[in-house]
Amino acid sequence: MPEHLPGLEVAARYRPCRAGLDIGGDWYDAFLMTDGAIAVEIGDAQGHDVDAAAFMGQVRSSMRALAAHEPDPSSVLTHTNQLLIAMGAPRFASCTMLHIDPHSGQVTGANAGHVPLLAAHQDGSHEIHALPGGPVLGILPNADYPDETFTLDRDTALVMVTDGVVEGPDLSLDAGLERTGTLAAQAVHDGLSADETADLVLDAAVALNHPDDLAVLVVRRI
C-alpha cells in the first residue's frame, strides 16, 4: 500500500493468526485510480495457512488488475467472483471495496459477504454501516454485487476490519462491532490520527486472544 494517497490519511494494521507466519488469509489494499479516485479494500480469504495466503494473493492481485478497467466496486467484485469460479478456486473470500473521491468525499462501496464497516465521528458517536452487496467471492456464479454511494465528511473516520477483530468465541458480531465502533469514535473525538486509531483497534482485538487473522484499515479525509 502506498505511503501517501492524495487527500486521504490511511492507516493499516495486520496480525496473522499463526506464530511464525508474516501473512495469512486477511488482506487490505489502497491505490490511486486513473480517474483520481482512490480504491480501498479489505478482505478475508478462507483459512489461515500458507495456502490461504497464496489464495489471498491471487484475489488481491486480480481485484487490483480488474480495478484498472472497471468503473466501480460493483463491477470489480462481480468480475472477481466470475474469475474465481471460472478458475475452480478451492476457497472463497469475503471483501469490502470502496472508491473514494478525496476532493468531494463521495464514496461508492460494495460488499461481498464481509463484516460491515464503521463510521466514527468527531462528536464521539459512531455508526455501523452495512453496505449492499452479495455473497462471498468464489461460490455462486452470476451473483450480483450492488453498490451504494455516500459522503465521507472530514470529521469522520471509516474503520474497516476483518471478522477476527469483531467476532470470536466469547464475542458476538453485533457486540464486537459496537465495541470497536465505540473505541474508534472515542479516538476520533480525542483527535488521534488514523495510525493511532488503527493501533487502538488492533490492540483491543489482540487482547481478546481470538485464534484468527486480524486486519484493520482506517481512512480519513484531510
Residue ranges: model-predicted function:
Residues M1-V159, D199-D203, L208-I222:
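… and, occasionally, acidic/histidine-rich disordered N-termini of signaling adaptors
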Residues H48, E167-G168:
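Short beta-strands and strand-coil junctions in structured, solvent-facing domains, enriched
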Residues F55-G57, L173-G176:
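Short, glycine/charged-enriched secondary-structure capping and boundary segments
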Residues P71, G191-L192:
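PAS/GAF/H-NOX family sensory domains and closely associated sensor/linker modules
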Residues A119-H121, P169-L173:
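Cytochrome P450 core scaffold surrounding the K-helix E-X-X-R motif
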Residues D153, A175-V188:
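Divalent-cation-assisted or electrostatically stabilized phosphate/pyrophosphate-binding catalytic cores
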